[in-house]
Amino acid sequence: GGTPSNLSVKQLRTLTDKMKDLFPWDETEEVAFECEPGTLSEKKLEALRDIGVTRLSLGIENFDDHILEVNGRAHRSMEAFRALRFANTLGFDQVNIDLIAGMMDETEDNWKRCVDTAIEQGPDCVTIYQMEIPYNTTIFKEMKAAGRVTAPVAIWPTKRAWVDWAFNRFEEAGYSVSSAYTVVKNPETTKFVYRDSLWEGADLLSAGVASFGHLGGVHYQNQADVGPYMTEVDSGGLPIFRAYETDHEERFVREFVLQLKLGLVHPSYFQEKYGEDVMTRFPEQLQ
């Protein structure tokens, strides 16, 4: 994550070689890699394949150049199509594309064209998000400066309706819904090991500036600025900014909420792992 495709081929090889020295990839089930389409060339994608990336995720978001521009995206549609073409010819195990519903200036017609274009491209997996404006984004700062209190994006009921339409459209095209965000072309062969493991409480070792991690029930975030981050790293310390240790109840509720995103829960899983009967703990939520 964190759009590592901004790194050069040389930097990527150096980084992953050092990672493999610490954590050999010989028996790795999945190596997922997030890309900004405008940063990709055929040479870089070849390097990613040779490094061992199995799941390539392209942050396309939309296929309309105007939408991409007004939302501050660095790439344009031709770069997205080019990246998809290269990725499909290089034989990655799985290619995912991200779409965002309700971006600034987006209309229902645009959204429907975007979904249909994604179907025409035929990726293995499509992940659909709904546009949000976090407080630390450029768009939010511009809103605050202008005295606006409402984000210039589609309202939540509209975004939910568009996502619902998209899921139905993908299912008509032969895709299967695998989570609250994701559709896959072939559920028998298309797996997302990282997501499924994380939603079952697996550790997540985050290394980047401002990144969030989860180790042994402790949630943490690294330093959000490069200066303090490098000061800690150069001195041999851990660049952790804040952390929170969860208890048994919090870990149980966390996993329950995360697995609701799959659209179903397995009571036996929680009974065996936490000794909790979700059917009696959350009867109203599971109705």
PLM regions and their residue ranges:
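Short amphipathic alpha-helical interaction segments
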Residues: 275-287
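C-terminal scaffold of the Radical SAM
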Residues: 1-276
